[in-house]
Amino acid sequence: MATQRVLPQSKETLLQSYNKRLKDDIKSILENFTEIIKTAKIEDETQVSRPAQAEQDHYEMHVRAANIVRAGESLMKLVSDLKQFLILNDFPSVNDAISLQNQQLRSLQEECDKKLISLRDEIAIDLYELEEEYYSSSYSQWDTDLPLCEAYHRVDNWASPSSSSSSTQGDQEEVEILPSQETEPQHHLNGQGTSSLEKM
């Protein structure tokens, strides 16, 4: 059996005032409604004339109806005050709601972790099968220490002879240009070449 929480004195006094307001408003509504019903009853002849009595009853009904409306508005205000009191002071309920949300988030996190671990294991198995297939295929002529991406890159370069031949041809042209530049006669700054040497 849950133990009853002990409220501070200020909160206890506030709750007692709420309870008193509730009882007073309900009592006011009940009494005024009962008097309206009594006033609507047609009485026997009295010393007051019927027009005066009707006017008096009409005024009394208006007053008591206004009292009922005022008591109803007071009850609505009381409901609003109670909601505010519960929101600001009902810490156990707030803590329970936070704990429940934390449990839901933890369960969702555990589920996501399990899915990620399962996905990691599946990827590892597929990668192992791909490596086995690679090393047992024709690509195994390359260095087995190379990663798969670098080995495939080398195979692509080897499979395109046009690019490799053009690159080797460009290298040969550069090699041919360099010796030709070295065999050309060097001219002096004064414009005299080998002819000046022959004259000497």
UniProtKB/Swiss-Prot annotation:
Principal subcellular localization: nucleus
GO cellular component assignments: mediator complex
Gene Ontology biological-process entries: regulation of transcription by RNA polymerase II
Ranges in coiled-coil conformation: 93-123
Listed Polar residues bias regions: 189-200
Claim: Transcription is one of the keywords in the record: yes
Matches recorded under Pfam families: Med22
GO MF, any single term: transcription coregulator activity
UniProt entry keywords in alphabetical sequence: Activator, Coiled coil, Nucleus, Transcription, Transcription regulation
Function according to Swiss-Prot or TrEMBL: Component of the Mediator complex, a coactivator involved in the regulated transcription of nearly all RNA polymerase II-dependent genes. Mediator functions as a bridge to convey information from gene-specific regulatory proteins to the basal RNA polymerase II transcription machinery. Mediator is recruited to promoters by direct interactions with regulatory proteins and serves as a scaffold for the assembly of a functional preinitiation complex with RNA polymerase II and the general transcription factors.
Subunit structure, interactors included: Component of the Mediator complex.
UniProt family annotation: Belongs to the Mediator complex subunit 22 family.
Name of the protein described by the UniProt record: Mediator of RNA polymerase II transcription subunit 22
Originating organism: Takifugu rubripes
Gene name linked to the record: med22
